[in-house]
Amino acid sequence: MSTPTQLQPPASPTYILRGHASPIHGLHIFHQNLRLISGDADGWIIVWDLVFKRPVAVWKAHEGAILEVKGFTFSNQTVTEVYTHGRDHKLCVWRFRAQDEDLLQKTLPVDISEQNQSQATQPWLVHSLPVNALNFCAFSMLFLDEEESPDTGEPEASDKTSTQSPGKNPPQHHSLFAVPNALNSGAIDIFHLPRERRLCTIPADQTTQTGMVMAVTLFYSSTRELYIASAYEDGHVMVFALRGQLTTQDFSGKASSDSWKWERVYVARAHSQPALSIDVFPAGGYFVSSSADALVVKHPVPGFGEVGTVKKVDTKHSGQQGVRIRSDGRVFATAGWDSRVRVYSCKTLRELAVLKWHKEGCYTVAFADVEGSFDSGGGATGDGDGAQVTKSGEFSLATVRRQRNQKVQKTHWLAAGSKDGKISLWDIY
């Protein structure tokens, strides 16, 4: 007799983070996988410590819903910068130092009252840039190389920026941002920070009524040429390339927007319904799109080595958004309106896992970095004492802290945010 195949039990989340009182719209794992940042439909931001699963900072960043949120650490991991995009038509940059964390509010939105909100201490608002937020398309950002960054001895910033920046001579991290154009919802604007200046506009396609821009992604080629992938309301996806490397002249006030010559290098009607999200894996020369229809499509990026072919799969499950490719390019995940998170193979597009826990639709997912080399000293949690090396056999608090950090950093986290306001953390693949 043949032995019946034993079915593996369904996957279950490792942790559930409960803190938001409204749907989760943005997630990002950063700080060497030690921090998770989340944003919700009421404009609240929470920075979570993934070691202790507790909030590090909580504040209301926008009066409207959060469209996207990103977090980064600088200055030997002692300074955190948070980039938020809200439905109040603002793109904000927030900053706090490791020594400020004890002073920041930690009361979660589900527990907060209006009185506590008025007395709350929030991070420094470094920049507030007016941008379009009418069509639910979140920003995409790209840090510039040092040789591309203009000299901003006197950066153009708001008065609020100059009075609230923590520390003396805070570092200026030059970056580009792509957002939909304010006048033509099918066009794309490129902004520069810290100059807070619009550099150019990629006009809407004149031959096709694509409708609104639904998603954008900025990325570099191997030769450091700037590319942007975009997805549209009618199901089209496109890729534009800016030929030649960027120079400081391109960011100076003397350069006009006409000096930015964009070339459309790829266009495809990939979906029958609005394309909801895209993500690019430059090292592999491809990007993935998901839509309100049931298709998941893998597209080649012309100019990235050998040009591949378009691959698509009918998943039988409509409404998958928030697509994210993991840093090693092996798997990607989508957030489903049916409350499921699905994990696919980047190579074959085969469905590898269906993660079911949430009772309501999921809107966003985030992967941990599985390829980075991490320094798990105490400085990663804002305490420099843990960076010291203990002798063999010596037991100390620093050793325990370092071991905890290493365990979290090496975990293949997948975070999912749902309409129910909860964040599920999964350890997969």
Swiss-Prot record:
Gene this chain is encoded by: asa1
Gene3D superfamilies assigned to the protein according to its UniProt record, in alphabetical order: YVTN repeat-like/Quinoprotein amine dehydrogenase
Organism domain of life: Eukaryota
Keywords (A to Z) from UniProt: Chromatin regulator, Nucleus, Repeat, WD repeat
Protein's UniProt name: ASTRA-associated protein 1
Function: Component of the ASTRA complex involved in chromatin remodeling.
Subunit structure: Component of the ASTRA chromatin remodeling machinery complex.
Family as reported in the entry's similarity comment: Belongs to the WD repeat ASA1 family.
Cellular component GO terms, alphabetical: nucleus
Region (Disordered): 148-176
WD repeat locations: 19-58, 64-104, 208-250, 270-314, 315-354, 392-429
First-listed, main subcellular location of the protein, grouped into a coarse class: nucleus
GO biological process annotation, one example: chromatin organization
Subcellular locations according to the entry: Nucleus
